[in-house]
């Protein structure tokens, strides 16, 4: 009897397991994903970080004469794992300074070494300083110009307790005759300065001769402030020595060769450096450690026949952030022309629960609709579901469907989030070259850019799960073939329908928020804009997937009917939103205006075409602040072409910060002012047309753009 019950229980469990497998779907087969799960190693990825940056070290000047230790290590491991075409490339960029000695002392009322650059490299803000100087310490509070008024700082060190802005404090101090500045370097004045009082955030100050700037933790700054408040005379000694060294963009390139059936290629990687003095285990090296493991696992699975050999050559890039990617693409235009997508891994390895974090994928912006987003999202959500214990499957045991953990890692939940675009990493640069790219990142990161960004914050389980997602997504993009391309297009279509539904939900919420008839009619316009905008984006996504097919030139013939079907989805959702409009019109005692006429302001905006006064680029107008230039042009963190910075230019009228990167791109597309307004309102939230016009007028005044009246349509000749 017991044996029969046992066999029956196994049968039930088998049925349940089958149901789980049917529910959990992604773009690769269950067998392929299971092979990836079994091979990808979070422990190896963590070992890579321990090889690359086991601690934050002071780089010896001799490294600038050859290759950096991180480059040599990752190149050696790539060769060991079977990557091909492994090379370290250098692009000289002039001269820079490397600190070799840095000691900050209190000499009275007692001798105390406060910081040593070899203990905390971030403590030396003035990385070019060469001086042995001593002076009394004086408190200048927040370090504003008013704080310096009437204060004699000549020959002294100043102490600032402002949470940031050490460079400005130093400049004011030295201008007033001070020999140096000590100030807090933290991420804002909020919880982080309280929760992490010993943390120093990386900052750089260019020092004048015989002066120095030191970055303090919030705790150390308060200790010094307390001593001064007690009336104690505090004397500071700063000892600094730095050497001028040849600067360069250094990167490591490696490949997994395609099968030769296509000239197309793909890219994946992270930044090995973000400057050569600042280092970090998560924000610098985790993406490189992860993608090195992704490549190792992929190569082994190909060799074992568990994954097909890629049709497209895979380029692994481990670079100086942004500028290194740009240097490589400029040096290899043949590669830039054939890469069809990039997976950028920026900060990947935190134990999520320690940092209140999610593992996030930042989508491409709506100005760059792409197939690539849904590949990453499908893989992330698949792994997240597998690792989640689902109560409806408890008959199979109180456990996740698949245990995706590392031997020495956590057993935490896998918190993932698909988020709107943000820039400030290498995916921005790829998009500036016309290559779709997404970024994966753990955020928030309580230790990034700081003295506490060290390997002890990392989790080998997080590495393993991220490696499974990354390997799966890479295999989809690299493998090719019409069958897999069709899977991606189908995924794009279905997820696109969901996103149009989200746009409808935004629109109907605008209607529900309306408290007057006038507001309701305006909300109906906004609702229509939101739904229509998302539909246009999704048509672009479908079209973009054509590059994955064996014959991309013939793909539009197959994809056009699918794109056209999206218009019917938009029409249906607009019609159902119209019913909600009627509901709220009755509530407010007004009649719906199904086709609202344009206001005089909208007519004027529709008639004004935005043109660049200079060169129009992929990223916007070349002269536009924050536009970042075009293909191969210069630019920094958060530049256009998918940048994440303000992009607002000089002081004056400005849109909300999160809209400005897209605005910069839209300026170069020869759209009307109304089309720009509708695009921003559709992608984000309704923005007043008057605000958009004020920003455009301000840009016109600065000479960045010109507003040109739309040419009148040709007169229709009357029939005789």
Describe the role of every protein-language-model region.
Residues 9-18, 299:
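Hydrophobic h-region of N-terminal signal peptides that target proteins for export
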Residues 300, 312, 385, 446-497, ...:
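His/Asp/Glu-rich mid-to-C-terminal helical/loop segments that flank catalytic regions of hydrolases
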Residues 622-626, 654-685:
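Short amphipathic alpha-helical interface segments
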Residues 62-67, 72, 115-212, 279, ...:
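Extracellular/luminal Protease-associated
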Residues 21-31, 35-38, 42-43, 47-154, ...:
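Noncatalytic luminal/extracellular "stalk/propeptide" segments of secretory-pathway proteins
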Residues 29, 107-108, 116-150, 201-281, ...:
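Soluble metallo-hydrolase cores and metallopeptidase-like ectodomains found primarily
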Residues 32-40, 53-65, 124-128, 139, ...:
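Second-shell loop/turn segments in exported
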Residues 39-40, 111-114, 211-214, 221-222, ...:
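Metal-dependent peptidase/peptidase-like ectodomains
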């Amino acid at each position: 009897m017991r044996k029969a019950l046992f066999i029956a229980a196994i049968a039930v469990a088998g049925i349940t397991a089958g149901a789980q497998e049917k529910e959990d779907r992604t773009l690769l087969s269950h067998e392929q994903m299971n092979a990836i799960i079994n091979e990808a190693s979070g422990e190896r990825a963590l070992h890579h970080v321990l090889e690359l940056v086991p601690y934050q070290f002071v780089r010896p000047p001799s490294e600038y004469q050859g290759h950096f230790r991180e480059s040599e290590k990752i190149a050696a491991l790539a060769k060991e794992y079977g990557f091909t075409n492994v090379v370290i490339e250098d692009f000289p960029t002039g001269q820079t300074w490397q600190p070799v000695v840095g000691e900050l002392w209190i000499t009275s009322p007692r001798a105390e070494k406060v910081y040593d650059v070899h203990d905390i490299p971030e403590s030396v803000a003035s990385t070019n300083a060469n001086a042995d100087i001593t002076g009394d310490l004086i408190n200048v509070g927040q370090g504003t110009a008013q704080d310096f008024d009437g204060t004699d700082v000549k020959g002294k060190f100043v102490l600032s307790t402002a949470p940031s802005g050490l460079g400005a404090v130093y400049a004011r101090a030295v201008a007033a005759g001070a020999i140096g500045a000590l100030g807090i370097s933290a991420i804002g004045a909020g919880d982080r300065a309280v929760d992490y009082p010993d943390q120093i955030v990386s900052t750089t100050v260019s020092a004048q001769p015989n002066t120095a700037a030191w970055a303090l933790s919030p705790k150390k700054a308060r200790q010094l402030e307390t001593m001064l408040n007690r009336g104690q005379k505090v004397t500071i000694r700063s000892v600094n020595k730095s050497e001028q060294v040849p600067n360069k963009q250094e990167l490591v390139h490696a490949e997994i060769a395609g099968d030769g059936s296509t000239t197309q290629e793909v890219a994946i990687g992270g930044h090995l450096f973000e400057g050569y003095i600042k280092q970090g285990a998560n924000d610098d090296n985790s993406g490189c450690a992860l993608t090195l493991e992704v490549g190792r696992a992929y190569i082994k699975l190909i060799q074992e026949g568990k994954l097909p050999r890629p049709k497209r050559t895979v380029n692994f890039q481990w670079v100086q952030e942004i500028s290194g990617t740009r240097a490589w693409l400029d040096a290899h235009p043949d590669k830039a022309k054939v890469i069809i997508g990039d997976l950028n891994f920026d900060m990947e390895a935190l134990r999520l629960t320690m940092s209140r974090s999610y593992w996030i994928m930042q989508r491409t912006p709506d100005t760059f609709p792409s197939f690539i987003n849904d590949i990453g999202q499908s893989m992330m959500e698949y792994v997240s579901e597998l690792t989640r214990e689902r109560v409806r499957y408890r008959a199979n045991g109180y456990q996740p469907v698949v245990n995706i953990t590392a031997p020495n890692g956590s057993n935490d939940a896998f918190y993932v989030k698909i988020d709107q675009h943000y820039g400030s990493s290498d995916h921005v640069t790829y998009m500036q070259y016309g290559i779709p790219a997404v970024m994966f990142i753990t955020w928030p990161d309580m230790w990034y850019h700081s003295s506490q960004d060290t390997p002890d914050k990392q989790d080998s389980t997080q590495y393993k799960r991220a490696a499974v997602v990354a390997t799966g997504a890479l295999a989809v993009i690299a493998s090719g073939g019409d069958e897999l391309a069709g899977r991606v297009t189908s995924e794009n279509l279905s997820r696109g329908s969901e996103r149009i539904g989200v746009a409808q939900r935004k629109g109907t919420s605008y209607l529900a928020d309306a408290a007057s008839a006038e507001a309701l009619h305006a909300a109906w316009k906004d609702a229509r804009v939101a739904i229509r905008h998302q539909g246009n984006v999704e048509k672009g996504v479908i079209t973009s997937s054509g590059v994955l097919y064996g014959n991309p030139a013939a793909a539009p013939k197959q994809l056009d009917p699918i794109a056209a079907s999206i218009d019917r989805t938009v029409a249906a959702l607009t019609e159902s939103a119209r019913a909600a409009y009627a509901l709220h019109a009755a509530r407010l005692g007004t009649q719906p205006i199904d086709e609202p006429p344009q206001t005089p302001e909208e007519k004027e905006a529709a008639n004004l075409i935005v043109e660049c006064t200079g060169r129009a680029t992929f990223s916007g107008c070349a002269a536009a602040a924050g536009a970042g230039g075009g293909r191969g042009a210069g630019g920094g963190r958060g530049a256009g072409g998918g940048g994440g910075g303000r992009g607002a230019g000089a002081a004056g009228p400005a849109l909300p910060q999160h809209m400005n990167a897209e605005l910069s791109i839209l300026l170069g597309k020869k759209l009307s002012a109304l089309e720009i307004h509708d695009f921003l309102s559709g992608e984000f939230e309704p923005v007043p047309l008057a605000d958009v016009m004020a920003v455009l007028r301000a840009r016109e005044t600065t000479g960045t753009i010109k507003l040109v009246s739309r040419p009148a349509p040709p007169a229709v000749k009357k029939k005789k």
